């Protein structure tokens, strides 16, 4: 935790961090939907205790057989984005579930912005290979988008379930997100 917040070499200082508000619920780390997100709240606690991170990997493998497309309309301050996606995350973190990483230089825990990560639904195996390469190499291009946002409106053609910091949030067709800037004071 200390490492993730860049607190490793300091003592007795205070640092403020942003949190997110997703509809009526607050979260610190990530709100996500799509492939692999169900693993964060469906892996049994005793298995998580026994296997740690590997429990999430095992649970996530089940998702590979049921990849669903999400038809999303996302409105932020600068643009309207519409498309079919297999994954969406609104996060203030450099790692999402230990599976995906975002370059440390792109994330600031107290800038009033969260990162919006979108992964397009692949049309075929070739496009899937491109997406895997982009994920592995942290390339944000036409298949994977990374944007900084302070508020969003998200509309979905169906009610998709979300994971908020690993807890299930039942799906809705219309969702709102906003950053609460410098909401939490950490003393270290």
Kindly give the residue locations of the regions a language model identified.
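ATP/nucleoside-binding phosphotransfer catalytic cores, i.e., glycine-rich phosphate-binding loops
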Residues: 76-77, 82, 108-111, 118-188
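Short, conserved beta-strand edge motifs with alternating hydrophobic and charged residues
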Residues: 73, 84, 89-91, 115-119
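Short acidic/glycine-rich loop or secondary-structure boundary segments that cap or lie
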Residues: 37-39, 82-84, 95-99, 124-127
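Catalytic core of DAGKc-family lipid kinases
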Residues: 1-86
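Glycine-rich beta-alpha junction loops
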Residues: 23-24, 31-37, 91-94, 120-122, ...
